[in-house]
Amino acid sequence: MSFREVLIVGWQYLRAFVLIYLCLLTGNAISSLLPIIIPGSIIGMLILFVLLAFQLIPAHWAKPGCSLLLKNMTLLFLPIGVGVMNYYDQLSQQIIPIVFSCLISTAIVMIIVAYSSHYVHRERPIVGSTSEINNEQQKQEKQEK
């Protein structure tokens, strides 16, 4: 790999992380101005989504940074898991309600996803197809009899 290629790849990662970080900073700034409590990271994610959805910025600008973060997502959850252990006493007292709510919410999500997937992927008639025309002709013949 030549020095030029290293610089190009480095620039692509730098541009992606700067873009993601600018969206985060903008989201934090907007969050501090709002009268309701919405995390700045959520607002920043929505800003990044809008920028990409309306193609205000090309998707390949954010792709290198996003793919790197997604590859290492499990590693990024490690500090959160360690931080939760600071509240071990409180968690151990409430373990049954926590496990129960996790199981119920997981079941609800699975049911909703199943019905949504079934609805989205159902078989739809093709408008103007020969089978549709034949069905309409058969209905008309039955009505005439």
Swiss-Prot record:
It is a multi-pass membrane protein. It is found in: Cell inner membrane. One of its GO terms (cellular component) is plasma membrane. Disulfide bonds: none annotated. Pfam families: LrgA. Keywords: Cell inner membrane, Cell membrane, Membrane, Transmembrane, Transmembrane helix. It comes from the Bacteria. Its main location: membrane. The chain crosses the membrane at residues 6-26, 34-54, 65-85, 95-115. InterPro entries: LrgA/CidA, Uncharacterised_UPF0299. Belongs to the UPF0299 family. This is UPF0299 membrane protein plu1549.
